[in-house]
Structures are given as C-alpha cells and as structure tokens.
C-alpha cells in the first residue's frame, strides 16, 4: 500500500505473500499449501512443460501477474505475435496466488522518482496508478473473470500519536501528488467505517479494491491462452541471455526475453543480488458470524492497513473471513526462500504474532479459529523502487521490484512493456507510459552476505521496537530507531 515511510508505497503485500507447502500445526490451522486462496478450488490442472527447443517472437519468464498481463496486452495489441510464457511451477504459484488481495494505487519508490525526475513526472506516475485500479476491474469484467472484486477503497488507520502524525503527513503528501479525492477522518468517522480498537484517525482513498488473488490469476491465464498465447508450466528457467531463455528441457529463442520473476529473480544465474526476496506472512480466519461483524463494522469492505513501521494489511473476504498479513520472518540467509522454492510453512511464532495483531485490532475475534496460514516472498530492489526496463540493444526486458504493492502495479508495468516493445519494433512512437519516470531506472545490487541478512533483520528489529515504544509514548514524533532503520534501508 502507499507508504508514509517510503513515500509511494512499499506497504501491504499486493504482490508478495506466499510460500510454503506444509500441512497443519496441530491447532486446526492449515499451514502452507500455497495459500488460503487455493483451499476451496485446489491447485489448477497442470499445463504441459516445454517439450524441447522452441522459438517465439516474445518469451516471457514467469507466469504471475506481470508475465500474464504482459502477454495479454501484447497479444491484444499485435495478434500475430508468437508469445510463449515459461513458468517454473504453475501460474499463480508465487506472489500472484498468495498476496493480500489489495488492488490499489500504491507504487514503490514514487517519492524517489520525484527527487530524480521532478514532481510533475511523479504525479503522472501516480495518476497512471490511480487509473490502473479501474483498468484491472475493466478487464476482469470484459474477460468474465470472477475474482470477488469489491471496490471499497483503502483505509489506513492510526492508533498512536506518532502514527497519527505520520498519517497526516502521508495524507498531505498523497494530495500533493494529485489524489484530491482522498479523505481524512478522526476517531469517530473511522469507527463508522471499521471499529479498530484504539484508532484515532484514518485516511481513505477510493482508488482501491478487495479481490481474490488466485481467482484473478487463474482467470487471467485462461484469458491469455484463449488469445493464443502458449504457456508452459513446470518449466524453470535457469538462465536468461540475449535472445535465449534456458531451461532443463530446452531453450526458447526469441528477439525479446522478458523477466517477470519478482521474488524469484534470485534463482536466475547472475541475479542473486538483484532483488531481495523479502518474506511476508498471512493468516485467514474461519468465516465470522454476524454477531462478531456487528462489533467490527467494516460494511464497506475497504482494504485495511495501519501506519505502524512493521505494518499490517487485511481484507474482509467475500465469505466473511478476515485475511491479515504482516512481515513475519523478513528474510532468509542467502536469498534461500527464493532458491529453494519455499520453506515448509509459516513459523508458529509468526502465526501467533499475526493472531495477536488480529485480536488487538478486533478483540471480539479472540476465540475464532485460524483456518489457514502461509508465507511468501516479494521482490525488493536496493533502492525500494519498482521499475520497468527494456534494453533495446539486447532485447532483454524486465519489470518488478514492487515491494509488495504489485496487484495493480503489475498491470501498469505490463502495459508499459507492451508500449516499449512496440516502440522498439517500430510499430509506434513514445507513449505516455514509455515516458513515465520508472522506465529504464537503474539500481545497484544488494550487498553480499552476511551484510544483506544483518541489514534486513536489523531494520525490522528496529521497526518492531519502535512500534512498541510508540504505543506508550505521547509524542507525535516517530521513534529514532525507525528513522535509523529507514536510513539503513536506503529509503
């Protein structure tokens, strides 16, 4: 979601919760199994792997939102293109099938882009993101994808004096970037939307919707295939080179090779330190009865977040559960979560920590069952800025680094890749999207281990300590530990 900490969003896991293949925890909680979003309908039927060497006009590596949206818009724009998507597991195995279901207008690094390219350039990026929420809903409707979409907006709440100060600053900044339809609420108005214990204020934007992540990715994959795009699953790409995507089963040769791997980028040869695979974890309750919802409210089904440094994110699902997430164990040494596919479930201590947040926000949920827990990785560039790139000399392109805000951002990134390829191939000139400030942004790699591990864990330890200190502090100033952590992170 849009981040007061990072100006332009690194907040709630829009494109990044999910790993794990475990079963139970002994408490009635299904732990792992991809995510809660697959619990009812199960894993989709597998598509055939790559049968051998092949050629294409465009080869897309990664069958999540970024890859599928890119295939969709390219094929719509140029129907004769031969497009192949290579997916290591199945479409939606990664963050696209595990995230918090936040379709919203946050984009990681917007404030940094304002510094680099000017305020008006960043305003254009923000407007494009605002419009993207409606674009995703439009395509879902056009393609008859039932993804439980409900456009209730996004509500960010503050529960301490320091959080309230950050909220007000965040609200002012968002308006300065053109979001003039955003509204600021006091404690009473906040409670009229959602009764969060201790909430002293909130900021609401209409540019957001709740959705079911797996339903969206499954529907999008089907729509892409219906257009004539070839999808090969169970086909891990081990190396990307100009005009070559190399797999254990053969090599796909194409003028354009697009890397759309987000949190799994570290699995590719030579890309271990490009984007850090940050972990995020979630829980989903049992369906809650009417008497509990009467105490909570939340009738507008806004996506819900807070202004803590180690923030939470949540939605009220279509079947009246609360799905809630947070950072949990933030990073595994050596980018291991990406390289090994995922650990065997979410650590019990993380599950209990998320339950504590749930009950702290909504005390009447104290006795409810947690039906599912899962965890996963999202992609974080060293400067925390999402980017879209096409190298015109090599034909290599990539998009990502959404820092957990990818459900909508992937769509804008895909349309931008489409325009960049059409421009490069001489089919069009520059467009509004190809001139956005995140295009062809360059960033250095992450530090080698153990500095990477120490930095990330030190940062989140500082955030959690700062949040704890702020709960008892009357001062509106953010705790010094959090400010120090922001400097360590390079935000």
PLM region descriptions:
Residues 75-98:
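Glycine-rich FAD pyrophosphate-binding loop
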Residues 165, 172-176, 198-256, 260:
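Helical element adjacent to the flavin cofactor pocket in flavoenzyme catalytic cores
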Residues 98-128:
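Glycine-rich active-site loop/strand segments that organize a redox cofactor
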Residues 62-66, 88:
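Glycine-rich Rossmann-fold phosphate-binding loop(s) that bind the pyrophosphate
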Residues 392, 420-459:
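Active-site-proximal substrate-binding core of FAD-dependent oxidoreductases
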Residues 142-150, 237-239, 251-291, 295-394, ...:
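Active-site substrate-recognition segment that forms the wall
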Residues 1-58, 76-77, 81-82, 108, ...:
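Extreme N-terminal leader/targeting segments of oxidoreductases
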Residues 2-14, 26-33, 39-40, 109-115, ...:
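Flavin (FAD/FMN) cofactor-binding and adjacent substrate-gating region
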